[in-house]
Swiss-Prot record:
Protein known as: 2-succinylbenzoate--CoA ligase
Keywords: ATP-binding, Ligase, Menaquinone biosynthesis, Nucleotide-binding
Enzyme Commission no: 6.2.1.26
Family indicated by similarity: Belongs to the ATP-dependent AMP-binding enzyme family. MenE subfamily.
GO aspect biological process, one term: menaquinone biosynthetic process
């Protein structure tokens, strides 16, 4: 088994120096230019004391600066702890303390008493020091730590090794194929594993990336039509935004793949994509699996509507209930295994032992496999609403709500109920005139009685994280305050 590999970006710059690596707005950077920038950043970081094996927090927005910092830390042999720019100061301080970082590199205004904070601009204006650049990467070494969104309890730092990132990129290429003219539009934040994984694919495949600094549906819509984009990663909300802008039109046939993640997609949305010939590949993955671990190819978009597909070539997947593997169509916990799966959480041995057993990761997600082995993700176990002993999946109710023409967005959570234990409550963003009664009546026609929300509340917008995933915990707080 391969233990080490040549430094990825350095090798890529050697193999295809003049090929475009990154496009951002009107700027183009080749792989050799990117390598040179990274060496320079690495020398500046060496001057401020960054050494091999240390953990360095990165709080930056999508841009060439953030890309160079992430690569520079790998050149130095340090571990990048990627922080979510949308978190509060308290949450960020907690994560930095938990990860035992030696400093923070940021492009934002941030003050911390106990941790040295270096602004990227200051570091780059300061002196350089000769750096000892890692010529090889050990696949067993940690490359990044990314905190889980903490949908349950305190966030946990997921350790991803060079080997995890390599396996993820290889698995994806065996699944989607590679083409010389590939260009991946990157609009996911790079502090999330979905965004970060594109940086890995960029240097491993030698593939051009069109980087969008912040989510801008108008720019992305136009770029898909004019910039030669072949692949884009999206979540349902982004796809809905793009379809609105597309209207009666279509995207060029060169767009060969829309990789859709971030939870089960509403059927009406997928049906619209089929009508328009947009190749949507539904995926399932998480921080712990270094991004996707399952993908449904566009061939099955309609015959397997709602499925997340089958595992990547080097991955395995099964459904367990109470530690026993269950037959097709039986619901249970999704359990996965593969070289892209994390070895554990930083300083959380209990959580690691609980989650990973004999190399199998217990995801905390509920789903089932059909008779052909296609995965259907039902919901997060923690999002499950149990009403009078019946399991209710919020995603199913949301799908019904989203099929109403006057509903733009929908989120469903459990609400405490004296009689049933829990009942569903819906939060809706309107796209036209509609009343609570009309919404509930609409649900009554399409859902079992016990699944119909007991109330529907209107919001201007739903709470979402930086990758546009619905934050149900914030909806739960709203329910508690009612």
């Amino acid at each position: 088994m391969m233990e080490t590999m040549p430094n990825w970006l350095k090798q890529r710059a050697f193999l295809t120096p003049d090929r475009t690596a990154i496009e951002i707005e009107e700027e183009k950077v080749t792989f050799m230019q990117l390598h040179e920038k990274v060496v320079s950043v690495c020398e500046h970081l060496t001057h401020v004391g960054v050494k091999r094996g240390q953990k360095v927090a990165v709080l930056m927005k999508n841009g060439i600066e953030m890309i160079t910092v992430i690569h520079a830390l790998s050149y130095a042999g340090a571990v990048a702890v990627l922080l979510n720019t949308r978190l509060s100061r308290e949450e960020l301080l907690w994560q930095m303390d938990d990860a035992e970082v030696i400093c923070l590199v940021t492009d934002q205004d941030f003050e911390a008493k106990d941790i040295p904070v270096y602004s990227f601009a200051e570091v780059m204006n300061g002196p350089k020091e000769e750096a000892s650049i890692q010529e090889e990467f050990s696949l067993r070494e940690a490359m990044t730590i990314i905190y889980t969104s903490g949908t349950t309890g305190k966030p946990k730092g997921v350790i991803l090794t060079y080997g995890n990132h390599w396996a993820s990129a290889v698995g994806s290429s065996l699944n989607l194929g590679l083409r010389d003219d590939d260009c991946w539009l990157a609009c996911m934040p790079m502090f999330h594993v979905g965004g970060l994984s594109l940086l890995m694919k960029n240097i491993m495949y030698g593939m051009r990336i069109l980087l969008v600094p912040k989510y801008d549906a108008d720019f992305i819509h136009k770029a898909l039509q004019t910039r030669g984009v072949t692949i884009i990663s999206v979540v349902s909300k982004m796809l809905t935004d793009l379809l609105e802008r597309l209207g009666e039109g279509t995207y060029p046939s060169s767009l060969r793949c829309m990789l859709l993640g971030g939870g089960p997609a509403p059927k009406p949305l997928l049906e619209t994509c089929v009508d328009k010939g947009i190749p949507v590949y539904q995926t399932y993955g998480m921080t712990e699996t270094s991004s996707q671990i399952c993908t449904l190819s566009a061939d099955y978009m309609l015959t397997k509507v709602g499925s997340a597909g089958k595992p990547l070539f080097q991955c395995q997947l099964r459904i367990e209930k109470d530690g026993v593997v269950v037959p097709p169509f039986a619901e249970g916990e999704i359990v996965v295994k593969g070289p892209n799966v994390t070895g554990g959480y930083f300083n959380r041995e209990d959580a690691t032992r609980e989650t990973i057993q004999n190399g199998w990761l217990h995801t905390g997600d509920l789903g089932y496999l059909d008779e052909e082995g296609f995965l259907y993700v039902l919901d997060r176990r923690s999002d499950l609403i149990i009403s009078g002993g019946e399991n209710i999946y919020p995603a199913q109710i949301e799908e019904v709500l989203l099929s109403h023409p006057m509903v733009a967005e929908a989120g469903v959570v459990g609400m405490t109920d004296d009689k049933w234990g829990q009942v569903p409550a819906a939060f809706v963003v309107k796209s036209g005139e509609i009343t609570e009664e009309e919404i509930l009546h609409f649900c009554e026609e399409k859902l079992a009685k016990y699944k119909v929300p007991k109330k529907a509340c209107f919001l201007e917008e739903l709470p979402r994280n930086a990758s546009k995933k619905l934050l149900r915990r914030e909806l739960r707080q709203l329910v508690e305050e009612m």
